Structure formats: C-alpha cells, structure tokens
Amino acid sequence: MTVTDLVLVLFIVALLAYAIYDQFIMPRRNGPTLLAVPLLRRGRVDSVIFVGLVAILIYNNVTSHGAQITTWLLCALALMGFYIFWVRAPRIIFKQKGFFFANVWIEYNRIKEMNLSEDGVLVMQLEQRRLLIRVRNIDDLERIYKLLVSSQ
C-alpha cells in the first residue's frame, strides 16, 4: 500500500466517521430530539468540482494501468462524496436546552436576537456570530417559533 492509498483511506475513514456522527450520534446527543427541520442545501458547485476531480483521478488511474486498490479507494471516496454532498440533507435539530446547527451545539441562552427576513430566512444573532437558517419548507418557521417560545 502506497502513501497515496493511505491518504485515501484516511479521507474515506474521516468522511465515513462524519456521516455516522451526523446521521446516528448527533440526534442522540444532549437529550431527546424535539424537532428536526430540513434545511436548504448550499451551492453544489464545490461538490461537483470535488466529485469531478475524483472522477478524473479514477479515469487517469485506469488508463495508466495504476494499482487496482487505488482505483477502488478512489471509487469509495467518490461514493462518500456523493453521499455527503447530494444524498444527506442538512438539518437543524432542536433539543431541550439548545440546538444543533451545522453540527455545532448552540444553547438557547446564547441567542440575543431573532429576526425573520423577507425571503423567509430566520436570522439568529448570537454573542459574536449571526446564524442564517434557510428552511426547506416555509411552514417549518412557524414550528420553530412555537418550539422556541414554549422552551423559553
């Protein structure tokens, strides 16, 4: 196994660990889930570039008769990238004392101000940071509002 193969294995393991954490561990942390709301995806340009570059590497490895293990590892990396960028849906997970947004735990007492923009984006002002929450379904904003009002 070459250094390239080891690096590919490390990236695959890291992406797999992230996917397992995001799907199975994070919803079980910090108590029961009160509400999980799907969010809009951000631009997919980065993901297309990543998967495209991996496809170019696969093509280059196959045409130059590279090691088969490298080809399989590149295919696994492409599949993990496809899953994380296109299959997995980002979401905000509300718990009893806070919520997970972008895989970061934020307690409710850190929210200093909340606003709703004209285009349906919920803006939460924290101490030093502003969260822009773009929900997939506009009706979910009312569910979030009811949950936040009932928990305060």
Swiss-Prot record:
Q: Does the keyword Transferase apply?
A: no
Family matches, as Pfam families: DUF986
Its transmembrane ranges are: 6-26, 45-65, 67-87
Instruction: Provide the disulphide bond pattern.
Output: none
Q: Which UniProt keywords apply?
A: Cell inner membrane, Cell membrane, Membrane, Transmembrane, Transmembrane helix
Q: Report the membrane topology from the UniProt record.
A: Multi-pass membrane protein
Keyword ATP-binding on entry: no
Sequence similarity:
Belongs to the UPF0266 family.
| Annotated protein name in UniProt | UPF0266 membrane protein CKO_01158
